[in-house]
């Protein structure tokens, strides 16, 4: 589902998967200006509705310029905020996901481990129903 979400972000922003938009990737040290979609904590699964779950994700925007990092974080926020009953793009032969997304506004985390890139975080929850 995270790959499909990245495709949705790519379709609705200027970011490109694998270039400056990454899913669950920590091998992005060489890329200064990028968005990383991470899954930092477990989500919720309904015992009765087995095809539905809530997945907490975070979009990290990183840049050598603090204002660029903030602008990039808000670009993802604007693409995702208020999504309701949207089908994510199918990647490969995967299932169809119908989702609702609730976002928090991006906030400044500080500098990354290299001490030269500003990082903004935007937490969001994806409420997903597997349609196939």
Task: Show where each model-derived region lies.
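Small/polar-rich, solvent-exposed N-terminal microdomains that initiate assembly or binding
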Residues: 1-49, 83-95
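Short hydrophobic/aromatic patches at helix-to-coil boundaries
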Residues: 2, 128-132
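Predominantly extracellular/luminal cell-surface or secreted proteins
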Residues: 22-23, 62, 79
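Short acidic, gly/pro-rich beta-turn/loop elements at beta-sheet edges
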Residues: 46-47, 69, 132
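Oligomerization/assembly interface segments of phage tail-like spikes and tubes
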Residues: 51-67, 76, 117-128
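Mid-chain, well-packed structural core segment of small domains
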Residues: 65-89
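Acidic-leaning, charged glycine-interspersed low-complexity segments
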Residues: 81-129
